Amino acid sequence: MKVYLLLTLTFFSFDLICQNLYELDPNKNYLDSGKKLMNLDFGLHNLEQDSKNTEILIGIHGGDSRGFEWIYPLQKIDDDKMNTYFFRWDTTKCPQESIPLIMNEISKLEGIMKITILGHSFGGVLASLLLNEINQVKTDIHVIASPLASKDLEKYCDYIHPKTKNENISYFQWRTIQKIDFAFNNLDYDPQVIDFKESSVIRLPDKYRGNRLGHLWSISWVADNIDVIN
């Protein structure tokens, strides 16, 4: 009985720690699939354990994420040349506090030739702090519907968007229309707008698949259009 219980706990823990990207359902069971992502421990998780590639894709979620908004985008962007990862972090803390964790996790990966990072909302703020952290490896950083100019983050976290970036990094800002983004439309300024010349800025349209293109849908729209700029 003890052995059986131990095996049960072992497999249960493994299920929480390791998720397979293509076992996650973006459609009928999207809520349960989202929970599986958000139940992962804090850290960087390989969603394709059986694949060994030299390119990686990392999704960084925002605050109050339910996970499901990531399933379609990660599956859409993923291809046979890359491994897809999901970074779980404590969004109750300032983003600077999670930089050592993600950098330590990235440094453990061997043979990586290219990194693509997608940071959504608060996760984009964390991603922006990697502009001067990742060296040598070619890296594309995409921040999506992210409050990079947030007055609250500056006040409570001393967050100021970096002024420079490393030469190996390409930087892309994907901005929603503020008045239809419920995360930002109550503000008297657009917290997505910063002055950073070494980046490409893409303003998202107002509709996606016939619906309002708001905060959560923004990742899916980027997934459908990211190849246009690459």
Language model regions located:
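Sec-dependent signal peptide recognition
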Residues: 1-7
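Active-site catalytic motif of lipid deacylating hydrolases and related acyltransferases
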Residues: 19-113
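C-terminal catalytic-base region of ester-bond hydrolases, centering on the histidine
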Residues: 160-230
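Serine-dependent carboxylesterase/thioesterase catalytic core
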Residues: 77, 86-181
